[in-house]
């Protein structure tokens, strides 16, 4: 994103779309669970979904964690929902939300320009699809709003690190989610180290249930003021990285706002909110990990798990 085009008409459209989506329902996080045999709008029972998810896990050789919450019916689907998984870039929604809530005042902080260098891009493992563009490096600065946006829409690691720096480091994200009632999710390191994803590591992790509820509070609840909630949702709606993951598994006419993540050991994640036509939204998370360090990520597993959720809850 070039600084001179930081407020394209697309953003206005996305913000309006986000506002319409937000008007559909407000998530009130609860503890209710659907019975195993319960049926709602979807064609399958929760117990059927759990069996299908177990089958996907066996076939893939990965560990699969899933949690989804239908805000209209209160039905849930849970599979390894309370196990810890590496979070990877799913954290970027949290860091951007923390900037909006804790640092921005009436949009003034969002318009501040942040200086950065090629070294910053390289320290983020060279993963700066927007910050590393020649035209952006030539100016050596992007606004806070632009950096938050591209950290989500393009999963720009350099942008995320710059926002972590403004927040005071990764621990600020942990403090932020604790203030939302999330006692599980934690961020300890910077990009790219946080993606090391060794089996058994507890740092830089979350659980499917915890991150689903936190995303729900941010997008559908009152964790952010309405203006910030619309802006965060517009970034999630504009995400470009989930085409082979959630987007591939959900029906084409379901609006999707999400954030992906990937790391070593085949870690491959997607978390977000989807709005079926004429229905209350569904908040959903799929987290996966394997046991071999150089294992390939399995986008199809994430897409297939999302498809099970859509067929069960949709």
Swiss-Prot record:
> What Gene3D superfamilies does the record tag this protein with?
DD-peptidase/beta-lactamase superfamily
* Record-level Gene Ontology MF annotations: beta-lactamase activity
Task: Give the matching Pfam families.
Answer: Beta-lactamase2
Q: Which residues form a coiled coil?
A: none
EC no.? 3.5.2.6
Q: Spell out the family assignment given in the record's similarity comment.
A: Belongs to the class-A beta-lactamase family.
Query: From what organism does this protein derive?
Result: Streptomyces albus G
Binding residues annotated for substrate, in chain numbering: 259-261
Name the InterPro entries for this protein. Beta-lactam/transpept-like, Beta-lactam_cat, Beta-lactam_class-A, Beta-lactam_class-A_AS, TAT_signal
Q: Which GO terms describe its biological process?
A: beta-lactam antibiotic catabolic process; response to antibiotic
> Region Disordered: what ranges?
31-50
What is this protein's name?
Beta-lactamase
Question: Which key words tag this protein in UniProt?
Answer: Antibiotic resistance, Hydrolase, Signal
The positions making up the signal sequence are 1-39
Q: Which residues form the active site?
A: 89
Q: How is it modified after translation?
A: Predicted to be exported by the Tat system. The position of the signal peptide cleavage has been experimentally proven.
Source species taxonomy? Bacteria, Bacillati, Actinomycetota, Actinomycetes, Kitasatosporales
Task: Give any extra note attached to this record.
Answer: The class A beta-lactamase family has a specific amino-acid numbering system, sometimes called Ambler or ABL numbering and often misspelt as Amber. A multiple sequence alignment was used to derive a consensus sequence and then the consensus was numbered taking into account insertions and deletions. This allows use of identical numbers, e.g. for active site residues, despite differences in protein length. UniProt always uses natural numbering of residues, hence there appear to be differences in numbering between this entry and some papers.
Catalysed transformations (reactions): a beta-lactam + H2O = a substituted beta-amino acid
Q: Which domain of life is it from?
A: Bacteria
């Amino acid at each position: 994103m070039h600084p001179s085009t930081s407020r394209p008409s697309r953003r206005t459209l996305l913000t309006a779309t986000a506002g319409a989506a937000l008007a559909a329902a407000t998530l009130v996080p609860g503890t209710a669970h659907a019975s195993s045999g319960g049926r709602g709008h979807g064609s399958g029972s929760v117990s059927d979904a759990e069996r299908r998810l177990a089958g996907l896990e066996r076939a893939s050789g990965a560990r699969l964690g899933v949690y989804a919450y239908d805000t209209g019916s209160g039905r849930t689907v849970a599979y390894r929902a309370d196990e810890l998984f590496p979070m990877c870039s799913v954290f970027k929604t949290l860091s951007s939300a923390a900037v909006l809530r804790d640092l921005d005042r009436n949009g003034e902080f969002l318009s501040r320009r942040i200086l950065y260098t090629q070294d910053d891009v390289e320290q983020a493992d060279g993963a700066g699809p927007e910050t590393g563009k020649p035209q952006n490096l030539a100016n050596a600065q992007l606004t806070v709003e632009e950096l938050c946006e591209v950290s989500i829409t393009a999963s720009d690691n350099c942008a995320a690190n710059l926002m972590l720096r403004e927040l005071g480091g990764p621990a600020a994200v942990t403090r932020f989610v604790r203030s939302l009632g999330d006692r599980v999710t934690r961020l300890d390191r910077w990009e790219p180290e946080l993606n090391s994803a060794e089996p058994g590591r507890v740092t830089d992790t979350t659980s499917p249930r915890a991150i689903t509820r936190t995303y729900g509070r941010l997008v559908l609840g009152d964790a952010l003021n309405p203006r910030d909630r619309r802006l965060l949702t517009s970034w999630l709606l504009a995400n470009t990285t989930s085409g082979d993951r959630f987007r591939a598994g959900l029906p084409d006419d379901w609006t999707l706002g999400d954030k992906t993540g990937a790391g070593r050991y085949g870690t491959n994640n997607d978390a977000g909110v989807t709005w079926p036509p004429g229905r209350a939204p569904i908040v959903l998370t799929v987290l996966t990990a394997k046991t071999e360090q150089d294992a390939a990520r399995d986008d199809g597993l994430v897409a297939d798990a999302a498809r099970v959720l859509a067929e069960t809850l949709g």
